[in-house]
Amino acid sequence: MQHQPKKKYGQNFLKDVNLLKKIVSKANLKGKNVIEIGPGKGSLTNLITKEANLLLAYEIDPTLKPFLVFDTTKIKIIYDDFLKRDLVKDFDNYFSINCQLSLISNLPYYITTTILFKIIQTPQIVDATLMMQKEVGMRLMAQPNSKNYNALSVITQYFFNIEKIQEVKSHMFFPQPKVDSVVLKLSKHKSDFNTFSTSSQKNFITFVKAAFKQKRKTLLNNLSSVFLLPKTEIILFFEQNKLLTKIRAEEITLKEFQKISIQWFLFQNKTKESQLNNYILKKV
């Protein structure tokens, strides 16, 4: 069977069988319930079915159906865009309710970040073994005061421990992309900060994105711009939390971001409460 890879779906198929086996081995899928994004021609999928308890795969390209025929009842393939799916509904329909899932995928380069954020915000996914553009992988692992350190670095490291499995040269794919790739394994933290409420996690993500809004600007300027607050109020917050007014987001560690984000939203709530009280007093 012939299939012409579609550029609009970012289709680059890994040719190296030994590397495919290594990816599945490192993913440690024995007896687990697994999600695969983009099974493609099924090379990786076939190996997964030999290890997994159940496999739910999402394929956006229906022309790949002839390649995705397996002699097992352990797999279900949904021909749809993973990003548009109600994952909770899909998971409840196929797996047991409140199950823990492992995810595996060769991510399309052009939507890697979008998929990562969906994975991050899906609590059922406890680990993910991912092939991605090397540049994006370096950002995920980046540390403070490095050029690759950004909001994605902080947010991903907040939720997951990141292990680098292997770099993959571009010639190992068909068609050959212009850039190299890397395989990473993301394992959800079991530490205290990851037991925060959903609202606390959303606040953290909101704060980190705001802090890196314009990387070359100071934290003070970014917070003022995003939250529409006068700098005098933010300087007061900085003084209360012993922050330098010229500090930039790229200088702040993950643990510091955790502490600052909590204090920031407490500060905002107090500010709003104070403004409301002043308004009421003026009306009396």
From Swiss-Prot:
Its EC number is 2.1.1.182. Keywords: Cytoplasm, Methyltransferase, RNA-binding, rRNA processing, S-adenosyl-L-methionine, Transferase. Its main location: cytoplasm. The keyword Amino-acid biosynthesis does not apply. It catalyses: adenosine(1518)/adenosine(1519) in 16S rRNA + 4 S-adenosyl-L-methionine = N(6)-dimethyladenosine(1518)/N(6)-dimethyladenosine(1519) in 16S rRNA + 4 S-adenosyl-L-homocysteine + 4 H(+). Gene3D superfamilies: Ribosomal RNA adenine dimethylase-like, domain 2, Vaccinia Virus protein VP39. GO terms for molecular function: 16S rRNA (adenine(1518)-N(6)/adenine(1519)-N(6))-dimethyltransferase activity; RNA binding. One of its GO terms (cellular component) is cytoplasm. It is found in: Cytoplasm. It is an enzyme of class 2 (transferase). Pfam families: RrnaAD. S-adenosyl-L-methionine binds at residues 12, 14, 38, 59, 81, 106. NCBIfam families: ksgA (TIGR00755). Belongs to the class I-like SAM-binding methyltransferase superfamily. rRNA adenine N(6)-methyltransferase family. RsmA subfamily. Specifically dimethylates two adjacent adenosines (A1518 and A1519) in the loop of a conserved hairpin near the 3'-end of 16S rRNA in the 30S particle. May play a critical role in biogenesis of 30S subunits. This is Ribosomal RNA small subunit methyltransferase A. It comes from Phytoplasma australiense. The lineage of its organism: Bacteria, Bacillati, Mycoplasmatota, Mollicutes, Acholeplasmatales.
